[in-house]
């Protein structure tokens, strides 16, 4: 067998084994819908397969999505940490608390299933005027539906 043909077969075989998460996601459409709903410099939204093994979408900059914010229980976590903690739950999880001791800034968390049964999400938003996690959940549900999930 020619090396090029072997490489093509190997690539196709590996691609067939890769996990798939529902239908294709239109990143531009989802960026627009999420940005309009809860867009903020300190917002991170992560979508993953319900198995939690494949992140299929991330909204927000690297620093926001990797920064550990207060978890409202005395610890800290990132949006991906929150996703991993809530991925198997059937109901949405919503939390809100102060992110600074003086209460001048807050953090809100929301995670749960999306309208696409194969996907779950987690979101974190931090800032001086952050809406509660329940509001973020409602706005994201509408954004996901608008984007075709």
Provide a role label for each language-model segment:
Residues 45-51:
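Short hydrophobic alpha-helical segments used for membrane anchoring or interfacial signaling
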Residues 17-44, 55-149:
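Non-catalytic interaction/Regulatory regions outside core domains
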Residues 1-15:
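Sec-dependent bacterial lipoprotein signal peptides
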Residues 12, 54-55:
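N-terminal compositionally biased, intrinsically disordered segments and leader/signal-like regions
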């Amino acid at each position: 067998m020619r090396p090029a043909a072997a490489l093509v077969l190997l690539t196709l075989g590996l691609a067939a084994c890769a996990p798939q998460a529902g239908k294709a996601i239109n990143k531009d459409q989802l960026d627009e819908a999420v940005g309009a709903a809860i867009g903020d410099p300190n917002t991170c939204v992560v979508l993953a397969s319900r198995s939690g093994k494949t992140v299929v979408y991330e909204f927000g900059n690297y620093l926001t999505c990797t920064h550990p914010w207060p978890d409202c229980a005395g610890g800290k976590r990132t949006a991906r940490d929150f996703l991993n903690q809530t991925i198997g739950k059937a109901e949405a999880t919503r939390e809100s608390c102060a992110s600074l001791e003086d209460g001048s800034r807050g953090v809100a968390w929301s995670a749960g299933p999306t309208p696409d049964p194969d996907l779950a999400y987690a979101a974190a938003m931090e800032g001086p005027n952050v809406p509660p996690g329940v509001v973020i959940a409602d706005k994201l549900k509408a954004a996901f539906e608008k984007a075709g999930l």
